Amino acid sequence: MARLFGTDGIRALANGDLLTPELAMAVARAAAVVFTHGRVAKRRQVLGKRPVAIVARDPRISGDFLVAAISAGLASSGVDVLDAGVIPTPAVAFLVKNANADFGFMISASHNPGYDNGVKIFAHGGVKLPDVVEDRIEYFLDKQKLSPIGSKVGRITRFVDAEDRYQMHLLSTLFTRIDGVKVVIDCANGAASGVSPDVFKSAGAAVKVICADPNGVNINDGVGSAYPERLRAEVIRNSATLGLAFDGDADRCIAVDSNGNTVDGDQIMAILARSMQQRGTLRNKTLVTTIMSNIGLDRAMKKLGINLKRTQVGDRYVIEAMTQGGFNIGGEQSGHIILSDYSTAGDGILAGLHLCAEIIRTGKSLTDLASIMEIVPQVTANIETDDPTTLLNNKKIRHEISRIEKSLKGRVVIRPSGTEPLIRIMVEDLNPEKAERACSHLADFFKQEIQKS
């Protein structure tokens, strides 16, 4: 059986073959076994209380039945459930820590289309799970579950001030107010639709909001961080200082400058890392990112005397490296930005606020700030396959990848997707035409080998 958890929890077609109410309940009951033993059980015995879990979701229509299934699984296992409703993923991470909950569930498929959904789990302290804990949850899926009766079953109650707590936390992180910033916010018809406009207004910004009308099916539908076209047009039309686009669960953020140019996660990390260095808050002179970040980021950080540490793709691997090394900024090109002085997870709204604050602190435009790094052209392609491991171990393919990489003044990165049945190809070279040719050639080579198999 294939591993249930991918790079960011469980993600699949909602109510399809995998992500069913039955699976959601089983995962909840298995998680209850894993998280209510050992230290948790002892801590709760001392307090004389049942274990507590926070459950929340993004606005997808399937979130209703998945939250119901997970809440039922937890309560029937003796866990009290605090239902936080529709809030961003990083809000769940914050609230698990802030409310001293034992663990938390976020029902979201992040940037995926509205027909997908997913399950993300946070441990005590609001941290994402390492592989070993995910494996333990999978192990207990078909094992005997906790079955308390009478007064020992859990209660399900509304976490009434969840959003207010998160908003106050975000505002408390700012090193300056952002009065004078005119920002257009694209909420992707997702979880940021409720909280983000209020936060930016409270921080002092003049706010124009778009794509903040979720109906259960329009999340990420041609909007949000993966589709910045409308945001670009609105920034220019409104003569805004900048635009910010989040994804469906608001753990990603990309920006658009006043000229309509996209400022991606790499550029945002570079801007914020330099800001932290100048303000004396950058720990151990290091920024953590993944193998997919542009080589231009390496060059920019080297000029500043900032080390760049790379991990495999997935913000939880970035977070693990940050924790192990004592670093306090990291992220991904896609817009996951982790500022660990304030958050245990990637937080798009937090990153956007701090980007606005840096504009105020420096008095510079986002265009000027983003010029900190020169982006080396990258070309990407996706290859559909149900068996990425076999393809990536194919000797002919490995030889061809090596041959192509030697011909470039850049890199080739090829990896299986952690969330979809795909192999992702990325080719980087100073010459964009050369990168395009190399990527196209490798994509064709993969397809030929698939046809032969």
From Swiss-Prot:
Mg(2+) binds at residues 110, 247, 249, 251. The active site is at 110 (phosphoserine intermediate). It is an enzyme of class 5 (isomerase). One of its GO terms (biological process) is peptidoglycan biosynthetic process. One of its GO terms (cellular component) is cytosol. Belongs to the phosphohexose mutase family. This is Phosphoglucosamine mutase. It comes from Tropheryma whipplei (strain Twist) (Whipple's bacillus). The gene is glmM.
